[in-house]
A protein has these predicted regions:
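Short, flexible loop motifs at catalytic/binding sites
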Residues: 1-180
Length: 180
């Protein structure tokens, strides 16, 4: 059972129920439950993609965190076991940070250090966790403008989402604690 507190529920409602937000940015304190919230949003996006035909391209959800150890150690057990996605995945690999589902849907865990691997690909939903700690590699603004946001906007535009029968165009959740 998924249990979100009122502040988490408000963000979730705007992203997935009312679809008022396409790009949500949330700054919250330690202990707020941002990892849980981010995982719930990513899993919701996976279920939206599972409704689409196998031939629809770019059915990928990404979760990005500053390092691979962080994204793998925090999100893999949360998604696989706490949220029960091990029951829905055709295959999953903690080492690769990947979950494969029916209809060519994939959830990928990616370090910010490797964010350039997204270049040229398509993303239906992207979680970017702890942006304030993403300091290695290209700058955060450049990563958003030249890599992350284009994977969402170009492959999952309003027009393409309508053509594919998707619930919404691509979206993202940038969620972080303030640094310092």
């Amino acid at each position: 059972m998924i249990n979100l507190h009122p502040a988490q529920s408000e963000i979730y409602k705007h992203l997935f129920v009312e679809q008022k937000l396409r790009y949500a940015v949330v700054c919250c304190a330690r202990g707020w439950g941002k990892s849980y919230m981010a995982a719930v949003c990513a899993v919701t996006a996976v279920f939206e993609l599972l409704e689409l035909a196998a031939k629809v391209p770019n059915k990928t959800v990404y979760i990005i965190a500053p390092t691979y150890d962080q994204v793998k150690d925090i999100y893999f057990p949360l998604i696989a076991y706490d949220l029960g996605m091990e029951d829905y995945a055709i295959k999953m690999s903690r080492d690769l940070g990947r979950f494969w589902f029916a209809n060519n849907v994939e959830l990928r865990l990616l370090s910010y250090e490797s964010v350039e691997r997204m270049r040229g690909k398509g993303s239906y939903f992207v979680v970017w966790d702890e942006i304030s700690s993403c300091t290695k590699g290209i700058g955060a603004e450049d990563a958003w403008m030249s890599v992350i946001q284009p994977t969402i906007a170009t492959r999952w535009s309003n027009k393409r989402a309508l053509a594919y029968g998707a619930r919404s165009p691509g979206r993202s959740l940038v969620i972080s604690t303030p640094k310092g």
